[in-house]
């Protein structure tokens, strides 16, 4: 079980390889990364049998940028018939698992396996339960079977609290009919990824205020309004009338890069198509100057050296806050709804000073 298998957006296999190889080196896990361009997956093959497990245990999945999902395990070949018997035979070396996910890569060929996986899962789940290899226990590892075809599958394990919250890392979000653009799903997915669900009522509620830079027609504004926030939408373009009719949106025709709120707000969101360094500087200014407490900003990526550029920008942001003496929680992820971009989330942390006993 020395291979770490990872899902990703097609075309970003090289970024996954660069990122995971860097973490493996940090954790002294020897091996090599490999991937085929356009395959929507990558592998890190460890030279030691426990290498993949050490890599997963030493790295929080939520802090990875480009991998959508990961699992440690092995590839096995399957016959045309009686695939379940072959899988059960290989599972003798696996522990009892607490859940089962069948996955496929995010390519056209992978999507064609969707119906097969749905039907096969019913029979496989029954066989695993009867064999005592599957129980309903989230504390036990998750069994992840990624089908490359009907004849080849990656059998892997991942901890449910240190892997993707959805199969293949693809969220099942429904597009709101009254949202003005599909970009609204980017912000909703960002909240799912960066904010624990049990903290939404505390950090995303109706008594809050927000600013949406580059708002038109209002996809991201819609999410803020849907949580009951008062929103200032900054854009020289028109906003959707349905949003303006809510009475919760003030539309200002201004430049998103020069606008400064008169009073600090709770949230700033920005999906402006601009050079990533400029959007990163916007993040640093808004959080650093105290204009907002939390922010979600998209960074558009260059054509080459994408992981290196993201890493450089994140390091620059972090160094900027250190120089200001400000504690900030920083997250970055290429979300499923992102294309040639990554989404950054920043949250300014407040130091709680201990009061001296008199």
Enumerate the language-model features and the residues they cover.
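SAM-dependent transferase fold signal centered on methyltransferase-like domains
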Residues: 1-358
